[in-house]
Amino acid sequence: MSILTAIFQALFQAICIILPISENAHSAVFHDFSSRFGGENSALTGIIHIAVAVGIAVAMLKLFIRMINEFVFTIKDVVNKQAKANSQKPARQFMYNSLISLVPLLLWLIPCGSKGFLYTLLRSSQYNSTLLDEGIFMLITAGFLFAVIRVLTIKTNNKDITQLPAVVVGMVAFLIAPLGFSFIGVVFSVLLIFGIKTKQALNYTLYISVPVLLVKGIIELCTATVAMTVLQAIIAVVIAIVASFVLVRLLKYFVKNNLLSFLAWYDTAFGAVILVVGIFELIFR
């Protein structure tokens, strides 16, 4: 049974993280109907987050190698006093802006006493005996996706990412990642609304999702109250990496062929259902 749990949880997390359908909202539904409202962290959840990050990095290996090279060359330029914050190299600017987006996420590591870190405090809002907020978050995610679909039909996105969208993405990511939103769905949508090129927006979103997932995974491992076996960990890691690699390709296919509306309608339907359930929970609990 523990092996089946590892298999299904790895697939579930990979699908809900990479496709814009919100892992947190689906997880909250599972915990709600299991009457688990404590918000305890599972070591298996943490290790799968790390594995999904690895899978995304493998799927986008060329981009990650290029960014690592840019980072190394930047350090070299700093040592030699040749670094320029306004470098015109697109790859260097991409790296600079990704760092800008990630800086606000350091706030997650603020200690919050018995609650652990600020991240775990924000995350605990999912386990409040009602699915009302998750339903709202899912519908907002769907709204972002529909807005993007509309934007792409009326204008051509031809901008490169700059500091302003990078800062906005960082603040948005800080707020939404622990809640019932889809991180990839909302961040990708925000970038497209800013007019960023579609391919660059998707690459940027997936790129910054890797450190976000790594931080989440490490925090969950450090604060885990539910243990896992070595066999569970190995199986979950392998499945999550493979599934994530495939799902990145699938997401790119959806974006390239203008199929995001299917995911937007799924978010709408699922969000509406759990919103109604949440209303009844508020009335009868």
Which sequence ranges carry the predicted segments?
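Multi-pass membrane proteins that catalyze or facilitate reactions on polyprenyl-/lipid-phosphate substrates
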Residues: 1-285
